[in-house]
Amino acid sequence: PMLKERVEILNVVGTKLVDSYEGDWLNFIKNGPRKLYSNGEGLVERLVLEFPRFNDSSIYLDKEVNFYKLAQLAFWGIHGELAHTGYFRIEDMESMTAFADYIVPVALIVMKITQYSDELEDKIMSGKMIERDSSEEIEIRSASIYATAKLTESVNRRRKDLESLIIPQLDYRLWKHYHATHFPHHLTYTTMY
């Protein structure tokens, strides 16, 4: 879906990458601290500033809500590939949130951790579109971030002598398992997730 928009995004990102970083993401990474957030200089902060495509933000009750799903996911992938090599390791991975998308909310609903209002559930079950930046969409995504953080805390309390999980690890487990289900998820026309 949205192929034309996605091609345009890739062209814009590619042009910026070539113009500013010799076409190499590693040059972008090397150009700042090895942190996601660092007083405006962190990897996610720079990515959403320099590549507006990654600036996944919404306004809710007159306040900006930053989801940064794809920005965080990009560095989660890079970290996963390079951390074990010693070449690149993000120092503040614990500051990463869940990747607010379509699937994690389904996992949380099926597990009875969260629930929708009757009206919202009817919309989702009947396949009605949830508008991008609507209160409903922002609340679904925000609730999934909050609930996943709380679930991670709960799991870690039970793992006393084991290495603690970080939120993206739990997010992946939820996503992987529930991605294959046929339980309806919310539908939003967006390239942000």
Describe the residue ranges of each PLM region:
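HhH-family (HhH-GPD) DNA N-glycosylase catalytic core used in base-excision repair
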Residues: 1-193
